[in-house]
């Protein structure tokens, strides 16, 4: 039996990865990890929605130390105002790197993969499904194929059972992810990409700020990829 744990943060990437995993594995478990980021005020509800919608078991784990370390690092994801960007600024590599640094969570993906690996090792092994993609890999080094390859090398020594990381979106940009979501009939409008979400609509859709980097990337990818965006925004991003 093929088993997978999907690291689910609630955004487009992990939502696409979740739907993909359900097509490729016999047993799928969602794992959402709370570390004190500002978007967690909606993340858990998003995870619970997809768990119910897709009938997938969900585990929510809290790790307080990562919140503490992120505050030391000055990450705007856990404290302060997240930077606002335009679509044009995203094309400026130095500006994009600067924005990435401001929301960086110290060794986040390394830590989260470790938690997922521990769960899978306890269950007898399996694959960790992550939403790493080509577009974010340009500014976040822990979203790259090189990172996945090196993590998988380490996991051979770190677990008693066979555990590996699988990144089905690694060659895709946001446009490609949008097309995959449409192909999989995913209810992406119930996912949340926003660093500073504004609550929910009456029917349970997250309200995105429309101003942060993640909102701009999301809207641009959906419009350019499938020609529509069902996401609810406080302010519609300009692309």
From Swiss-Prot:
Q: What class of enzyme is it?
A: ligase
EC number(s) given by UniProt: 6.3.4.20
UniProt family annotation: Belongs to the QueC family.
Keyword ATP-binding listed:
yes
Binding-site residues for ATP, renumbered to this chain? 8-18
Pathway assignment reads:
Purine metabolism; 7-cyano-7-deazaguanine biosynthesis
Q: Identify the HAMAP family for this entry.
A: QueC
Keywords attached to this entry: ATP-binding, Ligase, Metal-binding, Nucleotide-binding, Zinc
Q: Could you tell me what reaction this enzyme catalyses?
A: 7-carboxy-7-deazaguanine + NH4(+) + ATP = 7-cyano-7-deazaguanine + ADP + phosphate + H2O + H(+)
* GO molecular function (one): ATP binding
Domain of life of the source: Archaea
Question: What does the UniProt function comment say about this protein?
Answer: Catalyzes the ATP-dependent conversion of 7-carboxy-7-deazaguanine (CDG) to 7-cyano-7-deazaguanine (preQ(0)).
Question: Which amino acid positions bind Zn(2+), per UniProt?
Answer: 194, 209, 212, 215
Cross-referenced SUPFAM superfamilies, in alphabetical order?
A: Adenine nucleotide alpha hydrolases-like (SSF52402)
Task: Supply the name of the protein.
Answer: 7-cyano-7-deazaguanine synthase
In its UniProt entry, the species of origin is given as Pyrococcus abyssi (strain GE5 / Orsay)
């Amino acid at each position: 039996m093929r088993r997978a744990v999907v690291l689910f943060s609630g955004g487009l990437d992990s939502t696409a990865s979740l739907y993909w995993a359900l097509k490729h594995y016999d047993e799928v478990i969602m794992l959402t990890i709370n570390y004190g980021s500002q978007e967690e005020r909606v993340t858990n509800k998003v995870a619970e929605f997809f768990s119910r919608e897709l009938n997938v078991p969900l585990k929510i784990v809290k790790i307080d130390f990562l919140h503490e370390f992120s505050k030391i690092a000055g990450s705007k994801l856990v404290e302060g105002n997240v930077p606002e960007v335009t679509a044009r600024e995203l094309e400026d590599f130095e500006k994009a790197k600067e924005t990435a640094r401001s929301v960086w969570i110290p060794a986040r993906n390394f830590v989260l993969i470790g938690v997922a690996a521990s769960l899978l090792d306890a269950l007898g092994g399996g694959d960790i499904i992550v939403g790493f993609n080509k577009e974010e890999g340009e500014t976040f080094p822990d979203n790259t194929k090189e990172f996945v390859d090196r993590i998988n090398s380490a996991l051979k020594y770190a677990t008693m059972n066979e555990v590996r990381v699988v990144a089905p979106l690694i060659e895709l940009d946001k446009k490609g992810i949008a097309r995959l979501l449409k192909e999989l009939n995913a209810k992406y409008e119930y996912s949340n990409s926003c660093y500073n979400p504004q609550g929910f609509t009456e029917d349970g859709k997250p309200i995105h700020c429309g101003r942060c980097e993640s909102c701009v990337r999301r809207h641009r990818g959906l419009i350019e990829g499938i020609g529509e965006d069902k996401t609810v925004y406080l302010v519609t991003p300009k692309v």
